[in-house]
Amino acid sequence: MGQGNSKLSSDDIKKIMSKTNYTSEQVSQILKDYQSVNQDSKGLSLEEFKSFFSIRFKDYDDASILHMFKIFDSDKNGRISFKEFVGALFIITKSPVSDKLSFLFDMFDRDLNGYLDLEESYNILKLALNTSVGLGFDVSQAGSFAEGLLNSMNRNSHGGITKEEFIKKASVNDTFVRMLCLYQSYDTLLY
């Protein structure tokens, strides 16, 4: 799938469906929406990303949208590919907590070693904090989760946290889960 992503192969659609639980129709609608803002077919620029998300998240300021853009631009090329776009939507829509946490882990395990190291964990926490601030949470509410995550990493000989450890630790922290899963009021606007 190139940056323009004008067509998805059936394998691409199946992969997206298996990772996100979106239906084939939803994937098609997401692609249509993506293409409607991807004017130059090179992936979403920051301005295109802002135009899509600012309609759906009216209370987000430019700094929050920029931060989301930087986080979801996983290859750091200044463009949001369709794969990155689907990831962004999946994270901010109402999906099962364990699926969302699994996806978060996969998205932030950039070196694909099966562990979140300190920097990768920090990036997840930044996402949660940025999201929560945009929704009116007190930033200090994430402190206990962050501390627990970092403490468990320090106790592990591998210097990181596995997907299973992350899901277990994150899913029992109501504050962290709410910070990432608060988009229920946006259900009708998102997928």
Curated annotation (Swiss-Prot):
Xref: InterPro entries: EF-hand-dom_pair, EF_Hand_1_Ca_BS, EF_hand_dom, Recoverin
GO biological process, alphabetically ordered: regulation of signal transduction
Residue ranges of domain EF-hand in the record: 25-59, 60-95, 96-131
Coiled coil: none
Family annotation (Gene3D superfamilies): EF-hand
UniProt entry keywords in alphabetical sequence: Calcium, Lipoprotein, Metal-binding, Myristate, Repeat
Protein name: Calcium-binding protein L
PANTHER family for the chain: CALCIUM BINDING PROTEINS (PTHR23055), CALCIUM-BINDING PROTEIN L (PTHR23055:SF74)
Residues covalently joined to lipid (N-myristoyl glycine): 2
GO molecular function: calcium ion binding
Lineage: Eukaryota, Amoebozoa, Evosea, Eumycetozoa, Dictyostelia
CDD domains xref list: EFh (cd00051)
Source species: Dictyostelium discoideum (Social amoeba)
Superkingdom, natural source: Eukaryota
One matching Pfam family: EF-hand_8
Family: Belongs to the recoverin family.
Binding sites annotated in the UniProt record for Ca(2+): 73, 75, 77, 79, 84
